[in-house]
Amino acid sequence: MARPQQRYRGFRQRHWGSWVSEIRHSILKTRIWQGTFESAEDAARAYDEAARLMCGTRARTNFPYNPNASQSSSSKLLSATLIAKLHRCYMASLQMTRPSSLPEAPRIIASPNNAVKGIGADAMLLPKKREQEEQETGGNLDFKKVKVECSQQFKPLEEDHIAQ
C-alpha cells in the first residue's frame, strides 16, 4: 500500500502522532534536524525558515515568503544555535559553488629564486608578512606563478536518499 501524499515538504509524522522536521542540503550532503512539533503546519513553517536560511531566496518552501510579516512567529520555531548552523551551511555551499563558476586565477607565491617582471613585492604580501620577508631577504623578493586547481567529486543522490 502506498504512503499517503504529504501536504507539506520537509517533515514527517511519528507513529505516536508528533511531527518532526529536517532539511537536507544536496551539495553538502548533510541533514539538519529542526526538531519535534505539535502540528504539521509548525513543522512545515520550521522547514521553510530553515530552507530560506540554508538556500537563500531560491529555496523551495511550503508557504509563500512575506518579508513584511513579523519574524517572531517563525523565529520561535528555530533555536539560535540551529539558525547559526544553517547559516554556516549556506556560507559553505556558497564557497563550494563559487570556485566552479569563476575562471581559475593563478596564485602568486614569493620565492627567492624565481622572478616575474613587473610585479613588486609590495603588491603581493600582507604588511606584517612583507616586513618579515624584507628583513629576511633584505627587500629583494622574487615571485613564481603557480596554478592551483580545485576538483571535488560529488556522487549523485540515490532515489532512496531523497525525501519526498
Curated annotation (Swiss-Prot):
Gene3D superfamilies associated with the record: AP2/ERF domain (3.30.730.10)
Chief location of this protein within or outside the cell: nucleus
Official protein name in the record: Protein PPLZ02
Residue ranges of DNA binding: 7-64
Function: Essential for all lupin cells independent of the respective tissue.
Keywords (A to Z) from UniProt: DNA-binding, Nucleus, Transcription, Transcription regulation
Species in which this protein is naturally found: Lupinus polyphyllus (Large-leaved lupine)
Claim: Transcription is one of the keywords in the record: yes
Entries under InterPro entries matching the protein: AP2/ERF_dom, AP2/ERF_dom_sf, AP2/ERF_ERF_subfamily, DNA-bd_dom_sf
Cross-referenced SMART domains: AP2
A Pfam family of this chain: AP2
Any one Gene Ontology cellular component term annotated for this protein: nucleus
Origin superkingdom: Eukaryota
Localization annotation: Nucleus
Molecular function, one GO term: DNA binding
